[in-house]
Structures are given as structure tokens and as C-alpha cells.
Amino acid sequence: MWLPLLLGALLWAVLWLLRDRQSLPASNAFVFITGCDSGFGRLLALQLDQRGFRVLASCLTPSGAEDLQRVASSRLHTTLLDITDPQSVQQAAKWVEMHVKEAGLFGLVNNAGVAGIIGPTPWLTRDDFQRVLNVNTMGPIGVTLALLPLLQQARGRVINITSVLGRLAANGGGYCVSKFGLEAFSDSLRRDVAHFGIRVSIVEPGFFRTPVTNLESLEKTLQACWARLPPATQAHYGGAFLTKYLKMQQRIMNLICDPDLTKVSRCLEHALTARHPRTRYSPGWDAKLLWLPASYLPASLVDAVLTWVLPKPAQAVY
């Protein structure tokens, strides 16, 4: 009885692997990538440039654009883009249209993102959440909507970089909220544009060493957040809480942050070049073995584990 089931599962796995490895012919199609100053965006831009794609890379800063242009081929073009500014997005869309012309846009990679303040929710303000949502959620939505006509023209692909923290909210702050929102947008977009030949993939990296996970930056923002708290709130948590929280954060980041960014860029490249791109990619050992399995566990169990890991406030009653 079990043998036919086992053979059937094995056959399915082999067929899936064969299908997953089918690639499109070599292409010089246009791909637009946001957030190419550093990290995943910069690495992907250079990889695609080497493969012959015509890369249109957007950077937030002039120095980021200049550094990228210096090491890339003449096929790669850069522009400045602030994805939180609707006028900047429209200007970038016109710039892309000027380059692609009748060919259309084959690929859009929404990569730009920020961490914001990672810390206890009661420490934060509405503006703290809004700033992160503007970059990580509303930014990609605005860029995607502005470029949809060009993507439809080429029957192109949208790749949105979210996070495993868009599947499991492991900490407070706007980051998890923003990534959950981008996941939902991507799922609904995928179904809505499939009729027009546009494919949508989500890449959910685990923890990697990028500017978003820079410990010095994360610690500075949380210390500034603590300093602005009312004395009563500081008393609830106690002076030792911040020190314990930062030490815990440092231990976790040093343990699980992967320095190999190519694990992510390879997934992004596959989503652009595979004949049958996956709906979701989860690069990183921690994503596959820790965060995604945990997202399917009962919420009460996940709550218990995370509550045990995080330090307790001085005046905790539970």
C-alpha cells in the first residue's frame, strides 16, 4: 500500500525538479530594480548585467548610483528614485518607458526597504510605523502600479522581496507589519494580472548581513527610542531592560545572519529566467528550518517561546 504512494511522491518530486530547471532562452530584456545602492539590489543588478540583461537600476543616493555605474557595463543605466515620493516614482516610470520603448519591461524587482525601529510596540508612535510602511509597502505598490502597462506590454514579471518576518511577526515595530502587507499585495496582484501574462513571485529571505540588519544602526535607533520615552514608561521596563534586549538582539543576529547574499540573488535570478518561476522563494537556512516551520505552529506555542527568549519588563505581571 505504501509503495505506490512512495513511488508517486518520488515521481512528482523528479518532475517538479525537471520543470523547475527549465530556463528561458538567453535574453537582453529590460529589468528595473529598486534599491541598488547596496545589498541584494546591487548584487542582482551586477549579476543580470553580466548575463546580458539591460538593467535599469534605481538608487536612492547619487554616490550609490555612481559606484554601481563604475563597475557595470554600458548596458546598465542608473537613475535616482525615492519610492516614498509619488512624483519621483512617476519620473522614474517615464525614464523606464524612454529606455524600453516598444519592447516593454520584462522584469520589475521591488527590493528597496528599511528596518525602522525594531523594539517593543508600546515604545513606538504612529509615525514610526508610517515611515516604514511608506518605504516597505506603499513604495513597492506605487512603483508596481506605475510600471504595470510596460510589464503588460512585455508579459513581464514582478518580483517582490518581502521577508520571513512577513510570515511570522517575531518582533515589534513596523518592519513585520510592512512585510505582511507586501505579501498580501503580491498574492492579490498575482491573481489579478495573470490574465495578462504577468507572473508575480515573492522572495522571503531569512536573516542576511545587509544594511537592514546592521547591528549598529538597529541599536542606535532603539536607544534613541528609549531616550524619548516618558519616565513612567521607562520605569515600567526598568533600566536594565534595554541592555538585556540589545544583548539578546546581538546574540541572535550574530548567530543567524548569513553573509552569503548570493543565496538571495540566485532566487531573484531564477524568478526572472525560469520558464516556470515559483510563487515563493525562501532563501536562507533559518528561513527554511526555523521561521517558516514556526509560522505553521499554534500561535500560543510561538508566543510562549518568543516571550521566553525576550527579556521581561521590571514591572511585568505575567
Swiss-Prot record:
SUPFAM superfamilies: NAD(P)-binding Rossmann-fold domains. Glycans are attached at residue 160. Pathway: Cofactor metabolism; retinol metabolism. Changing residue 264 to G: In FALBI; decreased stability. It is a multi-pass membrane protein. Changing residue 157 to W: In FALBI; decreased stability. The keyword Membrane applies. Pfam families: adh_short. Inhibited by 9-cis-, 13-cis- and all-trans-retinoic acids, with the most potent inhibitor being 13-cis-retinoic acid. Weakly inhibited by oleic acid. Residues 310-318 are cytoplasmic. Optimum pH is 7.5-8.0 for 9-cis retinol dehydrogenase activity. The active site is at 175 (proton acceptor). One of its GO terms (biological process) is steroid metabolic process. NADP(+) binds at residues 32-56. Catalyzes the oxidation of cis-isomers of retinol, including 11-cis-, 9-cis-, and 13-cis-retinol in an NAD-dependent manner. Has no activity towards all-trans retinal. Plays a significant role in 11-cis retinol oxidation in the retinal pigment epithelium cells (RPE). Also recognizes steroids (androsterone, androstanediol) as its substrates. Belongs to the short-chain dehydrogenases/reductases (SDR) family. The last 8 amino acids of the C-terminal tail are important for a proper localization as well as for the in vivo enzymatic activity. Homodimer. This is Retinol dehydrogenase 5. It comes from Homo sapiens.
